[in-house]
Amino acid sequence: MFSEYSNDPNSQSVYLWGESERLTPGDLLERLQHYHAMSGLETDHFSLGGTVKLLEEQMASLLGKESAIFMPTGTLANHLALRHLCQSQKRVIVPEQSHIYNDTGDGLEKLSGLKLIPLGKNRVCFSLNELKEAIRNAKTGRVDTPFGALVIESPVRRKMGQTVAYSDMQRITDYCRQNSIACHLDGARLFMMSAATKIPIIDYTKLFDTVYISLYKYLNSPSGAILAGPKDLLEPMIQSRRMFGGALWGAYFFAALALKELTSFEETYKKAFMTSELLFSLINNLSGIRITAFKNGSNIFLVRLSPTINPEKFRQALSEYAIYLDPNQRPSRTFTINVMHPYYDKPKNI
């Protein structure tokens, strides 16, 4: 039976899956202590002030936005962004494969009266022509039903981390501006995507009115999110956040852990992708195994084993060197692996 993870907290294990480091409670406490020693933790009051405010200010600057607000979850960040963008026009265009459309129930409709219109069935994103047709149909029906906002999610978890091409983002958001439709980026994994595509974060964010960033995906905070955008749009969200039960009494632990990661994220992931490219090229010189990228991919790669390799024995051999594959993918000759930033500083003598 192959092992799926290491129980040794001191081991230099490599996990080829997931969206953050495998941090134990002890790891988190150690990082908090380090942050407090170096920078000093400052408490907040219902998610206002202190270290939370510092995170908001740094995120606003990194994302090129006027303001930013802490949210306890990405679901709430996306919800409040669309709720406040759609004050009069209540219809929202979303990708059919998006988190907002598939994983939030009917929350936007039930709680904020917004109607989601999915486009781009079973694809990473809809096309500009699909968008034009939807807008045209909304204007020419018996009742004019204009759109208030549009969402782009990138990378897309349901499509193996594939990204929306930057040129497509430009064309879609330009057309929305011409039609007075606000644009929101579900950029939960934006920092990682920027490292993968080598397109600066701010080049992505300048296309959108509002941007959501996850704090637990790749930024190693246990929870939390950031929503960035215009100050006059975000300030009223302080009240909405509280109304929705999202004004945590003390959120500074979450903020501090994300701040600690921000200081090294760009350089760390740059090294991770450079190292993985070299590693994959070396592996592809071996017989019986092939690693390939997805079209417009980010950090998820496809691995194929030849019929001569037993998948279970392959996993077992890796686990003996503390290298672990996704336990949710049962042994198969075709599976995926993720580029995670601990790669480059954990050498393995295999």
What do the PLM-derived regions correspond to, one by one?
Residues 112-155, 163-171:
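PLP-dependent aminotransferase-class I/II
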Residues 151-157, 200, 206-287, 291-298:
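Active-site C-terminal subdomain of aminotransferase-like
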Residues 84-102, 132:
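Conserved PLP-anchoring active-site segment centered on the Schiff-base-forming lysine
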